[in-house]
Amino acid sequence: MNNAAEITVLGAGSYGTALAISLASNGHKTLLWGHDPKSMQVLAESRSNERFLPGIQFPDCLSIEADLGKALAASKNILVVVPSHVFGDVLKQAKPLLRDDARIVWATKGLEPETGRLLQDVAREQLGEHYPLAVLSGPTFAKELAAGLPTAISVAGTCPQFTHDLVELLHSPKRLRVYANDDFIGIQLGGAVKNVIAIGAGMSDGIGFGANARTALITRGLVELSRLGEAIGADASTFIGMAGLGDLVLTCTDNQSRNRRFGLALGQGKDVITAQEEIGQVVEGYRNTKEVFTLAKRLGVEMPITEQIYQVLYQGKAPVEAAKELLSRDKKSETLKK
């Protein structure tokens, strides 16, 4: 049994493992939990996650645990890195096992399925008001993060001390710069919307529209993110930071992004099911599109790019037709509110 850790990471996929490696590489005792005991045994024996991060060895400070109770007992700092559609279920499982002094941070990017609620609302529903909450987000492809290549992220939360402690835990002079941010809502929203726009950027490139169209789509996607953020009380300046523009540009322009590759396949004429199967991992943007569209409709926020992507994914519209509709929209002023 692991008696103590500075932080426990829930979720042994590519991103959860990469964050655990980064934390342990800083010299912090880190525990990584996954739901499948057999898979976790393989990780423990090989000291690597060959399925998602081949060739990258675990630091000595990284321990593996398949028992959720033991994993949660090991640390007061709990980092949740699971797909958004199981986020609530994982917290529900965790609730009776949490330490009284537990503090919850997540790197999950998305909103609640069907409702479009922010994950902070899901967390409060499952955990109550007792535990401090935080979120981290930014341009972080798992393979590059695990390999020690430099990047930067933002962290925001409900408790200033917890945010400060997370900055200290995560920051590494050689591999990861961490910015504190007081916009808890904006940091969460950026991670969901960028996945949607990345699918659109991939579709644009898959059709063959070129760099000009991709850049225009990214720019107007940022407008949509800012528009939605303003409607739910986010700070507009957040969206020109790491969790907004930073993550958006990364996800829209590099083929390490599953969302972008998914969009590429759609733009090349493949159907949704085939495109998802080709990726072989969770494409968060597929669900995020429905979630973001649901939230925008509920708030009456105009998001034409998101709406067209939704119609491609859920109503069978051809990507070329979606592009035509976007280009033929009424002429208007280029401002965030128009």
UniProtKB/Swiss-Prot annotation:
Record-given protein name: Glycerol-3-phosphate dehydrogenase [NAD(P)+]
Positions of transmembrane segments: none
GO molecular function: glycerol-3-phosphate dehydrogenase [NAD(P)+] activity; NAD binding
Reactions it catalyzes: sn-glycerol 3-phosphate + NAD(+) = dihydroxyacetone phosphate + NADH + H(+); sn-glycerol 3-phosphate + NADP(+) = dihydroxyacetone phosphate + NADPH + H(+)
SUPFAM superfamilies: 6-phosphogluconate dehydrogenase C-terminal domain-like, NAD(P)-binding Rossmann-fold domains
Active site: 194
Gene Ontology annotations for the cellular component aspect, listed alphabetically: cytosol
